[in-house]
């Protein structure tokens, strides 16, 4: 069972999930940040994939992404930094990033590398739901990677049911 599903089956309330941008404030700190957060009792971690045009993010995350990119963070480097993370970290790990760098990496390769690295889920805020259902869902499910869709207060009841 995926670690996200396990977490929500064991603990249905008071789940603390923390987001941070990979490569910020330092390029080398990603894996150590994850380890410290788990030791401090965090239940799940969202790791931001820095992108040059983070249109859905606020100023703080935009600044962190810009600094991370200037520091040299790439998706390949992030996966390299996380390749041994599961030897020490047991909580669910979720990547959050825009579709462009994921497509440059190759969606199928991205999902395969997520599985091999121990990434449990991915949030892609600019992935249209229709495209996900028609093109990407089967690829992600084949690798046991959960694509987590976002909703807002304006999301229709019909769409929420589909998600």
PLM feature spans:
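Glycine/proline-rich, positively charged
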Residues: 95-127
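N-terminal small/glycine-rich loop or linker at the start of catalytic domains
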Residues: 3-24, 58-59, 64, 85-96
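Active-site-adjacent beta->alpha loops and helix N-cap segments on the catalytic face
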Residues: 1-10, 52-61, 70-85, 102-108, ...
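Active-site mouth loops of central-metabolism enzymes
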Residues: 16-30, 94-106, 148-155
């Amino acid at each position: 069972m995926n670690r996200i599903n396990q977490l929500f089956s064991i603990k249905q309330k008071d789940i603390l999930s923390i987001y941070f941008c990979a490569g910020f404030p330092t390029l080398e700190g990603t894996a150590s940040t994850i380890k410290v957060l788990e030791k401090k009792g965090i239940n799940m971690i969202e790791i931001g994939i820095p992108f040059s045009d983070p249109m859905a993010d606020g100023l703080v995350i935009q600044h962190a992404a810009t600094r991370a990119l200037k520091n040299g963070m790439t998706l390949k480097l992030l996966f390299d930094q996380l390749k041994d993370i599961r030897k020490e970290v047991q909580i669910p790990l979720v990547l959050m990033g825009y579709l462009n760098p994921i497509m440059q990496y190759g969606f199928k390769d991205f999902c395969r590398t997520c599985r091999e690295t121990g990434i449990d889920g991915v949030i892609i805020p600019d992935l249209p739901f229709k495209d996900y259902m028609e093109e990407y869902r089967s690829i992600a499910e084949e690798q046991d990677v959960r694509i987590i869709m976002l909703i807002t207060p304006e999301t229709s009841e019909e769409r929420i049911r589909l998600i």
